[in-house]
Amino acid sequence: MDRIKEIRKAIDSIDTDLLKLLNDRAQLAIELGEIKNELRLAIYDPSREREIIKMMLSKNDGPLDDQAVVGLFQRIIDESRRVEKFSVSSDKNITTENKQRESK
């Protein structure tokens, strides 16, 4: 039972780290969206998305299989694209939007 608690504590710590890293990535996506908007570049760049997936697959040593890696990174990319679009379509804060959604 103690080992289960230890493992869960380690997982919780990793989850906290992942959340911080994902929010850091989202912040960079917001900045990228603003720059793309200034340069009149499209938010959606399928070749860049394919490049990210390919790079992550090449770095995958498991135990996650490639299908899991593709699914996870596709979701991360989708959310990054969403915050990029949001950053140029509104002056609202992403965090404010999330809090409003949670209160409903």
Question: For each predicted feature, which ranges?
Answer:
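Domain-level signature for soluble enzymes in the chorismate/prephenate branch of the shikimate pathway
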Residues: 1-104
